[in-house]
C-alpha cells in the first residue's frame, strides 16, 4: 500500500505517538479498511526515515488499544472490531484530549456542516418529526409553585412522576423490591450504569449493528463492546451463549422494540430464549425501551416484565416530547438504585426538576393515552406511505416492514460499498446514517422516515434515484 503518513521531527510530540494518531485517523476516515494489511515494520521505518523500534512501539500500542491485530504468518492488519472496542491512546492529559478517538466520526462532521443546506433532507436525525409531536397542554407555573414542588424532589426523582410512571408503564411488574431513578434521557441512564457496574477492561455484549457503537462513552472508559448478529427475530441465542463462554461478559444490552438502527422488533419466543440463557449464566440485561410509546399496535411483553430481577429497564418520553425536553427513567432492584444515587451525589449531577414537572403534567392529562394512540396512527400511516415509496427501489435496496419506532434499515443489494461511496449522499443532500457508524458493515443505512410527509416523499424519491444510479455506475 502507499504510505500516506508524514512525521514532523521538530514537534514535541514523540514520533511513535504521531504515527499512532495518524494511523487511527486513517482508519476513521476510511483510508484504511477493516482487515487491510499494513506495511511491514522495516518498510514503514524506511519510508518514514525513523528507527524500526519507533514503528514497533506505535504498532504495539495500537494493538493493545484494539485498532490493529497481528496474524501469525500474515503480518499486521486493521482490526475487524467495531468502533466501540477501540480505546483512546492515553499518554498524558494533553494527548488524551487531542486523541482522534474522542472526536466524532468525520462523516458526522461533514453531515453537520451541510445539514443547513436549503435543498438538504435530514433523515439522519434521531428525533420524531416536529409536525408529529403531540400538542400537550402544560399548566402555567409560578416560581412559588415550582419551589413548592421542589419539596417532593427526592434523590431518585420527583415523587409524583415516579408514581405516574409505575401506573402507566409497569402495571405488569411487581413494585416490591424495585425502584425508579429519573434520568435526563436513556443515554444518561447508560452512563450511570457504566460508572457503577463496570470497570476498564470489562465487556458488554449487544446487537450488531447497535447505536452503542456510535457512543464515545465506552471507549473513553476503556469498556469493550462485542456485537452479536441478528436475524428478524433478534440476536442469535447460540452466538450469545458461545460469546458468554468465550468472553467474560458483564452485561447484555438490548433494544428489543424497534431497534436502533435496524427498526427490528424482537419476537416473544426470542425474548424468552435470551432470558433463559442469561439466567443460566447469571448475566444482567439492560433493556433500552425508549421507543415503546411509538409502536403501531399491541406491544409485546417487555424483558423487564418477563424477568424483573434480571433486567435493568431504561425508558424515556424524550422521543415524544422532542430532544429539547430530556426526561427518562431507569427501573432496577433497590440495591442498584441506591448505588446509582450514591454515584450521582459524588459527582453532584442531578436531574433538572422542570422536565420532570412537564412530564408529570403530560402523563396526568386524561387525553394522554388518546394522544399517544393518535400519534401511533399517524406514524403508521407515514411509515406505510414511505414503504410504498421504497418499492420503486427494491431491486437495489433491501428493506423490511417495521412495527413502530423511527427507523427503516436499507441494505444495498449490489456490490459492496465503501465508506467513501457514502459521500454521494452528502453531495446530493440526502442526510442519512450509514451502517459504519453502528457496525463494521458499510453497505446499509438508517433512515428516519418520520420527516417524510407527502411533499418530502417526492424529494426523497428523486434524491435516492439519483444516488442509486451513481452508485450503480461507480459514481
Short names for language-model regions:
Residues 1-140, 345-351, 412, 423, ...:
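N-terminal basic, amphipathic alpha-helical segments
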Residues 126-143, 152-164:
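A structural motif shared across PLP-dependent enzymes of the aminotransferase-like
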Residues 28, 64, 171, 245, ...:
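The C-terminal cap of the DNA-recognition helix in HTH/winged-HTH DNA-binding domains
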Residues 71-74, 293, 305-339:
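Active-site PLP attachment segment
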Residues 340-347, 363-387:
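Structural signature of PLP-dependent enzymes
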Residues 427-448:
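Conserved PLP cofactor-binding pocket of PLP-dependent enzymes
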Residues 149-281, 293-294, 298-306, 462:
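Conserved core of the PLP fold type I
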Residues 376-387, 397-411:
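Conserved glycine-rich beta-strand-loop-beta hairpin in the small C-terminal domain of fold type I
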Amino acid at each position: 500500500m502507499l504510505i500516506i503518513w508524514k512525521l514532523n521531527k521538530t514537534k514535541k510530540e514523540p514520533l511513535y505517538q504521531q504515527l499512532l494518531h495518524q494511523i487511527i485517523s486513517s482508519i476513521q476516515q476510511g483510508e484504511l479498511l477493516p482487515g487491510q494489511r499494513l506495511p511491514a515494520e522495516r518498510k514503514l521505518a524506511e519510508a518514514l526515515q525513523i528507527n524500526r523500534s519507533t514503528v514497533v512501539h506505535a504498532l504495539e500500542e495500537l494493538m493493545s488499544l484494539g485498532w490493529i491485530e497481528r496474524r501469525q504468518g500474515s503480518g499486521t492488519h486493521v482490526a475487524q472490531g467495531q468502533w466501540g472496542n477501540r480505546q483512546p491512546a492515553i499518554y498524558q492529559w494533553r494527548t488524551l484530549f487531542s486523541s482522534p478517538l474522542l472526536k466524532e466520526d468525520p462523516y458526522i462532521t461533514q453531515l453537520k456542516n451541510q445539514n443547513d443546506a436549503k435543498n438538504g433532507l435530514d433523515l439522519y436525525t434521531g428525533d420524531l418529526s416536529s409536525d408529529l409531536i403531540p400538542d400537550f397542554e402544560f399548566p402555567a407555573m409560578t416560581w412559588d409553585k415550582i419551589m413548592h414542588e421542589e419539596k417532593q424532589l427526592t434523590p431518585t426523582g420527583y415523587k409524583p412522576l415516579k408514581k405516574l410512571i409505575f401506573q402507566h408503564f409497569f402495571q405488569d411488574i411487581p413494585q416490591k423490591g424495585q425502584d425508579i431513578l429519573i434520568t435526563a434521557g436513556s443515554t444518561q441512564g447508560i452512563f450511570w450504569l457504566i460508572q457503577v457496574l463496570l470497570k476498564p477492561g470489562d465487556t458488554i455484549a449487544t446487537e450488531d449493528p447497535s447505536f452503542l457503537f456510535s457512543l464515545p462513552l465506552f471507549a473513553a472508559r476503556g469498556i469493550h463492546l462485542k456485537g452479536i448478529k441478528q436475524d428478524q427475530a433478534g440476536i442469535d441465542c447460540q452466538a450469545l451463549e458461545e460469546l458468554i463462554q468465550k468472553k467474560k461478559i458483564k452485561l447484555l444490552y438490548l433494544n428489543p422494540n424497534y431497534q436502533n438502527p435496524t427498526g427490528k422488533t424482537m419476537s416473544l419466543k426470542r425474548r424468552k430464549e435470551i432470558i433463559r440463557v442469561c439466567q443460566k449464566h447469571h448475566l444482567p440485561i439492560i433493556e433500552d425501551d425508549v421507543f415503546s410509546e411509538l409502536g403501531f399496535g399491541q406491544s409485546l411483553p417487555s424483558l423487564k416484565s418477563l424477568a424483573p430481577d434480571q433486567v435493568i429497564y431504561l425508558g424515556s418520553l424524550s422521543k415524544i416530547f422532542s430532544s429539547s425536553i430530556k426526561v427518562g427513567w431507569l427501573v432496577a432492584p433497590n440495591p442498584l438504585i441506591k448505588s446509582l444515587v450514591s454515584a450521582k451525589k459524588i459527582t453532584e449531577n442531578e436531574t433538572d426538576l422542570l422536565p420532570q414537572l412537564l412530564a408529570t403534567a403530560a402523563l396526568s392529562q386524561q387525553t394522554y393515552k388518546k394522544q399517544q394512540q393518535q400519534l401511533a396512527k399517524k406514524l403508521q400511516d407515514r411509515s406505510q406511505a414511505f414503504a410504498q415509496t421504497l418499492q420503486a427501489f427494491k431491486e437495489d435496496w433491501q428493506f423490511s416492514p417495521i412495527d413502530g419506532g423511527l427507523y427503516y434499515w436499507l441494505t444495498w443489494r449490489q456490490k459492496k460499498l465503501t465508506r467513501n461511496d457514502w459521500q454521494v449522499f452528502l453531495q446530493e443532500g440526502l442526510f442519512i446514517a450509514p451502517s459504519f457508524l453502528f457496525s463494521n458493515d458499510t453497505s446499509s443505512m438508517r433512515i428516519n422516515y418520520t420527516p417524510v410527509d407527502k411533499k418530502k416523499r417526492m424529494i426523497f424519491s428523486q434524491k435516492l434515484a439519483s444516488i442509486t444510479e451513481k452508485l450503480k455506475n461507480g459514481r
